[in-house]
């Protein structure tokens, strides 16, 4: 499943090719995604300009503005689900059975575009992704039902050990489970939770509320470092994920513990252990993490 690093890699890959372009045509082939695609989406998007691409948690937010001042700006919310990708294509090749959505983008008023038209194509074999439209003002966007429950961004300066310590008090759930929930901090998926906890030296089964301030300091830093490294490496490709240019990610090659059950810890050579938490595989070193 694409997590924060994969979504951020996608966002950064789209920026130079998509921002400033005008939506010339919209093609929706399959509306039955995680939530049905709005039947009026084509009309909402037609002839709008893509002004910005932001990210909130695992959602991509494309701000689309109209030349008609009477039309408010809107936001196209895209979630990649478990197997989704957004690709920039120089032309529109014949769609495959899992290619559900295309935006044909022309150069619009933006100078210096390398191609007159490109296609932004959404592919999702399992159809757990989502494409939604909202005209909520930017100041109210955080109140959208899909965004309102999300925790703080891990790269927000406010996210630090003090924040983590304060928001884990009284929580008896395991710290890995708390990280995965996204309620305190967003984007720490299964791979990145295991890796962050290893770097912080914290056993994933430790009750979140028992972490000292010092351990929360280490964990907050480990979360930021792990996610930053994953973004730099293009994310993790375990099965389906590719970036907007079709390139695979390579962070999985750097993992200390994830998917290394029985192999020697890269630090102390103790065999890595695997357990199940909340129906998800967890990997840790019994010597380095306590």
Curated annotation (Swiss-Prot):
Reaction it catalyzes: Hydrolysis of DNA containing ring-opened 7-methylguanine residues, releasing 2,6-diamino-4-hydroxy-5-(N-methyl)formamidopyrimidine; 2'-deoxyribonucleotide-(2'-deoxyribose 5'-phosphate)-2'-deoxyribonucleotide-DNA = a 3'-end 2'-deoxyribonucleotide-(2,3-dehydro-2,3-deoxyribose 5'-phosphate)-DNA + a 5'-end 5'-phospho-2'-deoxyribonucleoside-DNA + H(+)
Entry's cofactor comment: Binds 1 zinc ion per subunit.
CDD domains for this protein: EcFpg-like_N (cd08966)
CC cofactor: Zn(2+)
MF annotations from Gene Ontology: 8-oxo-7,8-dihydroguanine DNA N-glycosylase activity; class I DNA-(apurinic or apyrimidinic site) endonuclease activity; damaged DNA binding; zinc ion binding
Record: active site: 2 (schiff-base intermediate with dna), 3 (proton donor), 58 (proton donor), 280 (proton donor)
Family per record: Belongs to the FPG family.
Function: Involved in base excision repair of DNA damaged by oxidation or by mutagenic agents. Acts as a DNA glycosylase that recognizes and removes damaged bases. Has a preference for oxidized purines, such as 7,8-dihydro-8-oxoguanine (8-oxoG). Has AP (apurinic/apyrimidinic) lyase activity and introduces nicks in the DNA strand. Cleaves the DNA backbone by beta-delta elimination to generate a single-strand break at the site of the removed base with both 3'- and 5'-phosphates.
Assembly behavior: Monomer.
Name of the featured protein: Formamidopyrimidine-DNA glycosylase
């Amino acid at each position: 499943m694409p997590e924060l690093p994969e979504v951020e890699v996608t966002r950064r890959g789209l920026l130079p090719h998509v921002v400033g372009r005008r939506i010339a045509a919209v093609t929706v082939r399959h509306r039955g995604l995680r939530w049905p695609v709005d039947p009026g989406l084509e009309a909402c998007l037609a002839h709008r300009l893509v002004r910005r691409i932001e990210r909130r948690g695992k959602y991509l937010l494309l701000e689309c503005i109209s030349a008609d001042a009477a039309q408010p700006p809107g936001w196209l919310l895209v979630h990649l689900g478990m197997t989704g990708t957004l690709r920039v294509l120089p032309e529109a090749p014949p769609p495959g059975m899992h290619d559900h959505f295309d935006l044909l983008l022309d150069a619009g008023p933006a100078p210096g575009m390398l191609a007159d038209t490109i296609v932004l194509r959404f592919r999702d074999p399992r159809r757990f992704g989502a494409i939604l439209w909202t005209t909520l003002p930017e100041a109210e966007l955080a109140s959208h039902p899909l965004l309102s429950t999300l925790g703080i961004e891990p790269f927000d300066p406010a996210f630090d050990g003090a924040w983590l310590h304060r928001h884990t008090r009284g929580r008896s759930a395991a710290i890995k489970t708390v990280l995965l929930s996204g309620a305190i901090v967003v984007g720490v998926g299964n791979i990145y939770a295991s890796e962050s906890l290893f770097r912080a030296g914290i056993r994933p089964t430790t009750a979140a509320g028992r972490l000292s301030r010092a351990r929360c300091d280490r964990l907050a830093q480990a979360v930021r470092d792990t996610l930053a490294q994953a973004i730099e490496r293009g994310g993790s490709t375990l099965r389906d994920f590719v970036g907007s240019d079709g390139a695979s990610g390579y962070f999985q090659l750097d993992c200390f513990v994830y998917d290394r059950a029985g192999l020697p810890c890269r630090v102390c050579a103790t065999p890595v252990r695997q357990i199940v938490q909340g129906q998800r595989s967890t990997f840790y070193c019994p010597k380095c993490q306590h």
